[in-house]
Swiss-Prot record:
Domain of life, source organism: Eukaryota
Organism annotation: Arabidopsis thaliana (Mouse-ear cress)
Lineage: Eukaryota, Viridiplantae, Streptophyta, Embryophyta, Tracheophyta
PPR repeats: 50-84, 85-119, 120-150, 151-181, 182-216, 220-256, 257-287, 288-322, 323-358, 359-389
GO BP term, pick one: RNA modification
Protein's name according to its UniProt entry: Putative pentatricopeptide repeat-containing protein At1g10330
Pfam families: E_motif, PPR, PPR_2
Length: 467
């Protein structure tokens, strides 16, 4: 007999614990159990048992994504004079982090210190991760330093904190000194390098991982996703490695989840292999918005903008809601097809219907849409109508359009604005020099190159560490 409603029952604490564990991932059932516990006064029966129920309720709401309810339960727990234990705090810390409630996380730190749980390794490790995720690397490292004999989980939390905050030199140095590593350790370092754009290093670490002599480390899905991201954004050697990973996934009959499938799709899309990208897309069983975004972007960026727009219509027919990344892909597709009116119409309707707040990157895409069609004056007027000062992404789009249509006068004006915003960006100086050369203004072209040298800027040559 399947139980679907508990509203007509009273529950003992033992029954409540059993049912909460049984329905851990069912939000409606958890709420019903919680309601019965409140209305039957069961939560005042036994302090020890009540503590277990509170902990389980907090963890249950956390599991179903109701972070604020988890945090509110802690307040109710204290008001009911039920003392938390070391198992209470890790779930609460995760809830504070997931709900971006930095102030609540700091308050939990104070509560843990006050109640003597700050020396529990499980609690300490949770705070290492919390401070790392909210951008306070100093507090994260201080908390880690207080852990006596940190286990591999604590070490991985420190690696993650460093990676999230761009401190990959320290992370890699510490990683190399770790006495014990696991797949999470290796994946965290690979992901950290990949997120920072250090793709050569990410691929190097992956190579060391699969050839590791200290222990056999088998890559997992998260490892492949991180490595594939670097493969997609590196050179042809990276693409070859990505194809080898794809072959490994197929040979091991690994299920193509949305995350793994999207990573493969994105790699093939950036490599220009649209047929394989479409094949991967068809193989993904549960097509979430990220998969749709990847295939639309791949088509839009590789000469099939109309097919990208058709894919967008299929996405809506599948009841998948577009997001900000979808909008960028759609605007790119319209720009490549020079469908200015359709692009502006979709920009307005998507933002309105799906409550998407456009960023400067979106506005930059609109400028690119208008400018690519040769409507440079309209693009400049659009920029002037924006409710904020245009940044480099917006002005850069107009500069790109000026290059396409060789409008040296407007290009020079926009280029000088960009140098004011990004005085250390070599591309702006090179662009201005090129515009002046096109206009046969050789003295100005030379002046721009000298200005770049005087600013201590040089073009970075491309390189590859893969053969």
């Amino acid at each position: 007999m399947r139980c679907t409603s508990f509203s007509s029952f009273s529950l003992s604490l033992e029954d409540a614990l059993h049912l909460l564990q049984r329905f851990l991932y069912s939000s409606n059932q958890i709420k019903q159990i919680h309601t019965v516990l409140l209305t039957s006064n069961a939560l005042v029966a036994s302090r020890w048992k009540t503590k277990c129920v509170y902990n389980t309720l907090i963890r249950s709401y956390l599991t179903t994504g109701e972070y604020k309810t988890s945090l509110a339960l802690f307040t109710h727990m204290l008001a009911s004079h039920v003392q938390p234990n070391n198992l209470t705090f890790p779930s609460l810390i995760k809830a504070a982090c997931s709900s971006f409630s930095v102030s609540y996380g700091v308050a939990l730190h104070g509560q843990a210190l006050k109640r003597g749980f700050l020396w529990d390794p499980f609690v300490q490790t949770s705070f290492v991760r919390f401070y790392g995720e909210v951008g306070d690397l100093e507090s994260s490292r201080k908390m880690f330093d207080d852990i006596l004999n940190p286990c591999v989980v604590a070490c991985n939390s420190l690696l993650d904190a460093c990676g999230r905050n761009g401190e990959m030199d320290y992370a890699f140095e510490y990683f190399q000194r770790m006495p014990v590593t696991d797949v999470v350790s290796w994946t965290t370092v690979i992901n950290g390098f990949s997120k920072k754009g250090l793709h050569a290093k990410a691929l190097m670490v992956f190579g060391e991982m699969i050839q590791n002599e200290r222990a056999v480390i088998t890559p997992n899905e998260a490892t492949f996703v991180s490595v594939l991201s670097s493969c997609a954004n590196f050179d042809q050697g990276g693409i070859r490695l990505g194809k080898q990973i794809h072959g490994y996934v197929m040979s091991k009959e690994i299920i193509l989840t949305t995350t793994l499938g999207t990573a493969l799709l994105d790699m093939y899309g950036k490599a220009g292999d649209l047929e394989m990208a479409l094949t991967i897309f068809d193989q993904i069983r549960d097509k979430k918005v990220c998969a749709w975004n990847a295939i639309i972007s791949a088509l839009a960026s590789n000469g099939r903008p109309k097919q990208a727009l058709e894919m967008f219509e299929m996405m809506k027919s599948s009841y998948v809601h577009p997001n900000g990344i979808t909008l960028l892909a759609i605007l790119t597709a319209c720009a490549r097809s020079k469908l200015v009116d359709l692009g502006i119409q979709l920009f307005s309707s998507i933002c309105s219907e799906y409550k998407i707040i456009p960023t400067s990157e979106h506005y930059g895409c609109v400028v690119d849409l208008i400018g690519r069609a040769g409507l440079l004056v309209d693009a400049a007027n659009f920029i002037q109508s924006l409710p904020f000062e245009p940044d480099a992404s917006v002005l850069g789009a107009l500069l790109g359009a000026c290059k396409i249509h060789e409008n040296t006068e407007l290009g020079n004006t926009v280029g000088k604005q960009l140098i004011g915003l990004q005085p250390q960006h070599c591309g702006q100086y090179v662009a201005l020099s090129t515009f002046n050369a096109l206009d046969s203004n050789w003295s100005e072209a030379e002046k721009m190159r000298k200005a770049m040298i005087e600013a201590g800027i040089r073009k970075i040559p491309a390189y590859s560490v893969l053969t």
